[in-house]
Amino acid sequence: MQYGDQTTFKQSLAIQGRVINALLMREIITRYGRKNIGFLWLFVEPLLMTFFIVMMWKFIRADKFSTLNMIAFVMTGYPMAMMWRNASNRAIGSISANLSLLYHRNVRVLDTIFTRVLLEVAGASIAQILFMAVLVLIGWIDAPRDVFYMLMAWFLMAMFAFALGLIICAVAQQFDVFGKIWGTLSFVLLPISGAFFFVHNLPSQAQSIALWLPMIHGTEMFRHGYFGDTVVTYESIGFLVVSDLALLLMGLVMVKNFSKGIEPQ
């Protein structure tokens, strides 16, 4: 194929795949290096964070406050919240770290953001699967009731993480101070993300307010898949899908608008 020739859709997909793969490899090597366990930190890092939280709940014997398995409760809330929080935090620095690569005509601003979010989602997903499998094997938690429903919830929240990453990156690109304080703001959002409570346990007025937050629907859905009908959940798949698509569209438009002013260095 000569330079300037029109590519087919299949060729464009192949090119896009190579671009994403190259950016992923560069990001992994840059972030984790080639020594010691290298890219294994991709999922060891979120796994360790979750491990410390689970052990804390285990040894304070949180089960005595509820008939619910509190380790399972933590495992079905905290890792998912950390996925979208970490993804949005990492998205902020994606452009500055890859400015020199934007000279290549096949590398776009959107690619750099997508790569970072994809890494965070992949790491969180692997850590979640491995840790839950280990906890089931050693008998600390029961096997999930509906794995497919849990996978659906995880996928929808991964989409939310990508959409949020686009929006946060775009806002931080326009206002530097926002990029510096988002880490703190996102940490403040954790208590209201549904990671540490069931909507059913809230007062009715608080329930109606909480259900306007997309991440609460994702957490409720994930927990419904794990606990089954033993718990009462209030998720709306339709609301979560519409919210994801709306946020994704908003994020794509915002990134497209500010990308025009990005100059490679």
Curated annotation (Swiss-Prot):
Keyword Membrane among record annotations: yes
Protein origin, superkingdom: Bacteria
Annotated TM spans: 37-57, 64-84, 121-141, 148-168, 178-198, 235-255
Localization terms from the record: Cell inner membrane
Cellular compartments per GO CC: ATP-binding cassette (ABC) transporter complex
GO BP of this protein: lipopolysaccharide transport; polysaccharide transport
A family per Pfam: ABC2_membrane
Keyword tags: Capsule biogenesis/degradation, Cell inner membrane, Cell membrane, Membrane, Polysaccharide transport, Sugar transport, Transmembrane, Transmembrane helix, Transport
Keyword Transcription regulation: no
Domain ABC transmembrane type-2: 37-258
GO molecular function, a single term: ABC-type transporter activity
Role summary: May form an ATP-driven capsule polysaccharide export apparatus, in association with the BexA, BexC and BexD proteins.
Family the entry assigns: Belongs to the ABC-2 integral membrane protein family.
Name under which the protein is recorded: Capsule polysaccharide export inner-membrane protein BexB
Lineage: Bacteria, Pseudomonadati, Pseudomonadota, Gammaproteobacteria, Pasteurellales
